[in-house]
């Protein structure tokens, strides 16, 4: 069976109601995601290679299960990984990395906080029409590329506030990671904890377990980057 098909099941995980069928493509994509985050915590530029694999495979998954808005977000994360790879690879004349791990200056931190609060508020109110719009855009693009796709039937979001938090904070965290700001890890911790709870409430315990692992990786990343920033003289919320 085709490796890229979500019907190509690697293993049935007997967790939750009915268990969970883990496909090969999801398993490989998940492993790539774990490697990406683990390497990022070590400040290894190779994290972006695995990040590209992760978002590409999950983009294919979202295409197959007709989550076209999520597919479009993977396009953003793909571009962010490319930019992050470039930004992290830049060096000074002394052949040192141009970007250093540091905290956001207070004015920037407050600006990003305002962006997050306003964006989450707006997304909570308009998440259904926003995802409908993103889905239509994705369908139009794919149809223009010659793919035989139709507009899927969309269901109202079951957790509009929490899904808005995860979407907005994921975008902001990815942007901050490409610039080596410590705060990205704090956001990933929040995102992962929310994901653990949401997937558990939906009965998808295998995914909830995966995000528990991601939470511990993000906590370790926070610890390591905070120590690295301290060694470089960077302090949280400094001017």
From Swiss-Prot:
Cellular compartments annotated: Cell inner membrane
One protein family per Pfam: NMN_transporter
Keywords annotated in UniProt: Cell inner membrane, Cell membrane, Membrane, NAD, Transmembrane, Transmembrane helix, Transport
Residues exposed to the Cytoplasmic side: 1-21, 69-71, 128-157, 207-239
Periplasmic topology ranges: 43-48, 90-109, 178-183
Transmembrane segments: 22-42, 49-68, 72-89, 110-127, 158-177, 184-206
Keyword Thylakoid tagged: no
InterPro entries: NMN_transpt_PnuC
Primary location group: membrane
A GO molecular function held by the record: nicotinamide riboside transmembrane transporter activity
Membrane topology note: Multi-pass membrane protein
GO cellular component: plasma membrane
Task of the protein: Required for nicotinamide riboside transport across the inner membrane.
Protein name: Nicotinamide riboside transporter PnuC
């Amino acid at each position: 069976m085709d490796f890229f098909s979500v019907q190509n099941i690697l293993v049935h995980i007997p967790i939750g109601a009915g268990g969970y069928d883990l496909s090969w493509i999801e398993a490989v994509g998940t492993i790539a995601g774990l490697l990406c985050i683990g390497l990022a915590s070590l400040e290894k530029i190779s994290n972006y290679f695995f990040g590209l694999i992760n978002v590409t495979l999950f983009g294919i998954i979202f295409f197959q299960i007709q989550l076209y808005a999520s597919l479009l977000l993977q396009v953003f994360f793909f571009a962010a990984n490319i930019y992050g790879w470039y930004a992290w690879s830049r060096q000074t004349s002394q052949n040192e990395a141009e970007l250093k791990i540091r905290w956001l200056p207070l004015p920037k931190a407050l600006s990003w906080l305002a962006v997050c609060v306003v964006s989450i508020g707006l997304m909570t109110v308009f998440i259904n029409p926003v995802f409908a719009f993103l889905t239509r855009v994705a369908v139009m693009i794919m149809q223009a590329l010659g793919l035989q796709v139709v507009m899927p039937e969309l269901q109202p979001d079951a957790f509009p506030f929490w899904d808005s938090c995860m979407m907005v904070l994921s975008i902001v965290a990815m942007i901050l990671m490409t610039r080596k700001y410590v705060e990205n890890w704090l956001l990933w911790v929040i995102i992962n904890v929310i994901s653990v709870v949401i997937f558990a409430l939906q009965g998808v315990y295998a995914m909830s377990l995966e995000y528990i692992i991601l939470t511990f990786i993000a906590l370790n990343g926070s610890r390591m980057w905070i120590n690295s920033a301290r060694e470089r003289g960077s302090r949280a919320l400094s001017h």
